[in-house]
Design a protein with these regions (language model features):
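Active-site acidic carboxylates
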Residues: 1-103, 107, 198-207
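Glycine-centered short loops/turns at secondary-structure junctions
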Residues: 54-57, 130, 156
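Internal catalytic-core helix/loop-beta-alpha segment
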Residues: 90-139
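Short acidic-hydrophobic, aromatic-tinged amphipathic segments that line or gate anion-handling sites
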Residues: 109, 186-194
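A short glycine-rich beta-strand->turn/loop micro-motif centered on a GG-aromatic cluster
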Residues: 135-138, 158-171
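Short glycine/serine/threonine-rich phosphate/pyrophosphate-binding segments
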Residues: 141-148
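Active-site-proximal loop->helix
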Residues: 169-182
Length: 207
């Protein structure tokens, strides 16, 4: 079935930020009940980190962790996904995977729910940095990546999602959510396309 009026292009924008969503040890270590297979995703994010840092563009990380008060605030979410209790504040599970560790200047925002915008200063950080768009990476495609892409659009930022730099526990969910994002909320692109855009921005600024 063909649906007219969908699959337009939002575009990258002139000052993108890289969002690294929940690539913490609790999602990458096989010993965790929340683990995703993110080996290839981590490699793709490392490449994007190199390019964004080279271009001196903003990078923002998120993690998920819960102290005792947070467990009350997020009780309904935790009841739905009891494995979230693994993400105890201060534990190794909430630390960013060391293969893509943040620089001291790169903020790591803690969130309690799916979207990186909900209950965090992310929108203010992006506005202060003069960003007009975001490149959303991390996990999981059907959960926090999708929620962040939708909220990015609703906050006025053009979202792009590099397909090699996001991952999920379920391939069908991954594919379906990338389709939905590309149809309605943002642009699903390749890592090569993101890198090419950053190179174009660099050439334009140099000129």
């Amino acid at each position: 079935m063909k649906h007219e009026g969908f699959h337009g292009r939002a575009g990258f924008g002139q000052r993108p930020a890289l969002l690294v969503i929940d690539v913490n040890v609790g999602f990458t270590d096989p010993a965790s009940p929340l683990v995703c297979d993110l080996e290839d995703v981590v490699a793709a994010i490392r490449r994007l980190l190199d390019e964004f840092r080279r271009a001196e563009l903003p990078v923002v990380y998120t993690t998920v962790s819960y102290d005792e008060g947070d467990k009350v605030a997020a009780a309904a979410f935790i009841d739905k996904i009891p494995a979230l209790l693994t993400l105890e504040a201060g534990s190794r599970w909430v630390e960013i995977d060391p293969r893509i560790a943040p620089l001291p200047s790169e903020p790591v925002l803690n969130k309690l729910f799916a979207s990186a915008f909900y209950g965090t200063p992310l929108s203010s950080l992006l506005a202060s940095a003069g960003c007009d768009s975001v490149v959303v990476t991390g996990a999981s495609t059907s959960g926090c990546v999708r929620a962040t892409a939708v909220d990015a659009l609703q906050h006025g930022y053009r979202p792009a999602v590099p397909r090699e730099a996001v991952g999920d526990r379920n391939q069908a969910a991954h594919d379906a959510n990338l389709y939905d994002i590309d149809t309605k909320y943002g642009d699903v692109v390749s890592v090569d396309q993101v890198v090419a855009h950053l190179e174009e921005l660099g050439a334009a600024h140099a000129g």
